[in-house]
């Protein structure tokens, strides 16, 4: 049986998380996150989130692809390429499939305007 360990087995992570308790609570207990979790987020907001998350995931996949190029060992290349594979062939594909059911094709996803918040996050 799986049990929840807020430290993920790391004393350092546990100390960092304890030190950031209030910001962590604001982050993980945000109304948007809560509404996704309990299914009360407005449908339109969820679709908007999926489009923006697609944009984010594309940037994230590119960053990991760059890690493949910059890797110094085969093991590093394998790790980074497996993450690129998971993102591009599974997680992003899920977004494409769900958005297609909403009438949003992948070309539209790929050319979607990036929200300011997303832009700020992906370019920091």
Give the residues covered by each predicted segment.
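Acidic, low-complexity proline/glycine-rich segments
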Residues: 2-33
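Alpha-helical bundle segments that constitute or directly flank the non-heme di-iron/ferroxidase center
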Residues: 21-26, 40-70
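Amphipathic, well-ordered alpha-helical segments in soluble domains
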Residues: 28-29, 56-63, 90-94, 118-121
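Active-site-proximal alpha-helical scaffolds that flank and shape metal-associated catalytic sites
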Residues: 75-124
């Amino acid at each position: 049986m799986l049990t929840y360990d807020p430290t993920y087995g790391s004393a350092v992570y546990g100390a960092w998380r304890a030190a950031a308790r209030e910001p962590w609570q604001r982050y993980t207990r945000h109304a948007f996150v809560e509404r996704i979790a309990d299914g009360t987020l407005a449908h339109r907001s969820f679709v908007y989130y999926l489009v923006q998350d697609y944009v984010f995931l594309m940037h994230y996949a590119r960053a990991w692809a760059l890690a493949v190029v910059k890797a110094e060992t085969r093991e590093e290349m394998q790790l980074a390429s497996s993450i690129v594979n998971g993102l591009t062939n599974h997680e992003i594909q899920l977004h494409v499939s769900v958005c297609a059911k909403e009438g949003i094709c992948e070309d539209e996803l790929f050319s979607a305007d990036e929200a300011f918040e997303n832009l700020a996050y992906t370019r920091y």
